[in-house]
Amino acid sequence: MASVFTDFKEGQQNGSGPRLAAALTPIATSQSPDRLLSFYNFSDSDHISADLRYSLFQANGVKLPKQEQNGWVDIFAAYWKAVGEIVKFEEYNPSASWAKVFDAWKNVANTLIRGYTNFGLQAWTVPCLYVVGKYLRVFAIKADTEISSKGAMAFGDQLQDDVAADFEKSAKLEEAARIINRMFTLCLSDRAPIEESRKWGIYNTTNLLFKTYFKLNSVGLSKNLLRALSASSADLPELEAFPKSHIVTFKYYVGVIHFLDENYREAEEHLAYAWNMCHKGAFKNRELILTYLVPCHLVTTHTLPSQKLLAPFPRLEKLFRPLCDCIRKGDLVGFDTAMFAGEEEFVKRRIYLPLERGRDIALRNLFRKVFIAGGFEESKDGQPPIRRTRVPVAEFAAALRIGTHADDRSRVDIDEVECLLSNLIYKGLMKGYIARERGMVVLSKGGTAFPGTGV
């Protein structure tokens, strides 16, 4: 109990939003494992408002305007009721329910929002929105899981309405998204001078909505947030003025949104920004960024990640290394095998399609070997030798047979080979043209036949 009121007192006296928000954290700490239980037991439903007013203000010596005091009393009264539902899990109470926890915490969120709109809570307290919004999402997911599992037990052998079932599966999280959206609007629409504005909370609430929309598989709704931010950009501080943690998360999600729209260059720009700013010790965050940055780089620059880059991330090393090795060697069968082996994870992460484009690079590397194996033309008049730039299509066809592990009975169609060559030329992976009447590929001279590879 003491820790809740101590956090509130020190937060108010020092003007520390994070310390104040700690008072509303709905979990016990290692320093105070009985924090929630003792807070709930300190009063009852008949006296909670009076007890809170005394403990928050009179006993603590915290002086605030009457209206603001009323707002905090209402918020902590709602918090007390939510804690009552949470501690049932600590006590192994059979009536414990995450759905009830969510409903009670939803009241905390709505009361906190009213505190800003009706009771004049100051802008420096917006970290309270971060904490309450974060756990609103957490409790919503737990509640939906609980409801879904109970529904499966109750209706295991009965017919169900699939459309309704899909909707109800995330009903609590949908509700949480609507409330967090109100927090977003609360921050974005504040007209106070920027020094004392809730606008400083805009990227944290945006990031929370991104996470929620992605969990709901409603990525399209995230674009509405970006449009709203763009429309209000003139009234917002520069992005660099916000905390790094807010910026990195925001840039990551914006990058992924562009990635899913197949705008890989824009995606790479945002993801690279997030990668460069991300704390070196934030292992999980850096791994998430690389999950999308590697495929982006593959598409935009046709280059592969180094072993040094992936070494600290064993999961990504296991995921990408087989593909990278096959691309580098021009092993088309090995590439197809690696894509099939990682298909489930690639589809889950939504990176399958850009990785599939790596087959073109593998084919480019296979055909590049043909070009290199062709050697040099005879030098004339003491000039340095230049590589043979006229290569028979039949040589590329032979390489394709090797790259696809074709047996002696398999036939490689020349028209198919010409089509593959044309595709590589069109995509800028080769420079030259096909002289069909002579069955020849004429490649550029001067080390530009295969751009970016040095030959």
Swiss-Prot record:
Gene Ontology MF: a single term: double-stranded DNA binding
Domain of life: Eukaryota
Keyword field contains Cytoplasm: yes
SMART domains per record: PAM
Keywords for the protein's UniProt record, in alphabetical order: Cytoplasm, Nucleus, Signalosome
Gene Ontology CC entries for this record: COP9 signalosome; cytoplasm
Subcellular location: Cytoplasm; Nucleus
Pfam families, per the entry: PCI
Domain PCI: 248-448
Homology family: Belongs to the CSN12 family.
UniProt cross-references to PANTHER family, sorted A to Z: PCI DOMAIN-CONTAINING PROTEIN 2 (PTHR12732:SF0), UNCHARACTERIZED PROTEASOME COMPONENT REGION PCI-CONTAINING (PTHR12732)
Protein name: Protein CSN12 homolog
Species classification: Eukaryota, Fungi, Dikarya, Ascomycota, Pezizomycotina
